[in-house]
Amino acid sequence: MKIGILTYYGDLNCGTNLQAYATLVAVRQRHPQDDVEVIPFHAFRPQRKPYLSNATLQSLLYDWRRIQQYNRFKKEFLGITKDNIIADIKSALHFIKERNYDIIYIGADTLLELDRLPQGCHDISAYWLSPDIKAKKVLLAASCKNTEYDTLSKPQIEKLSAAIKGFSGLGVRDITTYNLLSHFVDREQIEMIPDPTFSLPIDYSHIERYLQKNKIDIPKRSICFHTYRTDSWCSEVAAHFREKGFTIVSLRPAPWADIILNGLSPLEQLGVYRYFSLIVTHRFHDTIFALKNGIAPLTYVSDSSYTTTLGNSKCSSLIEDFNLYPQHIIDNPSELKARYFIERIEAILNSFDSRKEAIEHKIQSCAQAYLGFLDKSLTD
């Protein structure tokens, strides 16, 4: 059989690339005799730009390394040597159809989102596929980001209805996607499943080699930040915890950080979290990788474009699944201020150790649930 994995990949986002890799690994393990590939398709050009704000010559050199490492990862680990960027929806669907897949797994990541479509567009993205594509189609931890039924136009509702009814399995990653699909099919047909990266083992040799080669020593008491350049509260929060004896690490160039780690490959970054006491991040997969490495995340939602009208987001859904809500998330834009971050970080540092055992069990159950859904899809 020929099996395609339709997903996001190829930008400079560690989580995006690792979820694609985790999906590829899991599907190949269950189809050892079949031709399994990540479909070499983008509906838009992936962002692959260096960090220019607060850049130094050294940070630009590390960024250049990061870009090269991501190119290598795409080729060696995802098996993609040529990208096909097809913005036109009909042309994209034709491209996928002509590859003659027997099975297509759609997911993970937010590829079911509709806010990348042009303003006023009443179509749905090619990632939803269409009834014309006759392969067996399975949603595999897919997310619609912030798409809500009430925001859809009548043509979009009709097209989504036809697309969803063509899926053999409906495995979704968050409550927002579950709620959207429940307008089209019975809730019993939809299954909430974890992100594929829960099933991906961590090989620490990648980050160990990187740190040794670059002579980087990360002290035990370290707090990492993965933030936007416009997050003005960072410097005050960093200064507060530096005074308390913490080393400040940043995954992007930042004048207030003691150590900058912007040159990591996806597999290097996957293992770096274990060197921190805590990470402050706006990234969904940072949160997962922190938990997998046994450290505390404080996740924040940067603006309302990432949430529904009810305040749900992929990050809040994840934090709730681990019974870490509300302490481990700041999802109110009015609380994106230094004092709120300082209060939360101090509270988390004082309480997280008592939760580690439960978190470890939850991570194992997440991996089993994801792989269990995949196994079930083989027989459905």
Please state what every model-predicted region is.
Residues M1-D380:
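Active-site anion-handling motifs in enzyme catalytic cores
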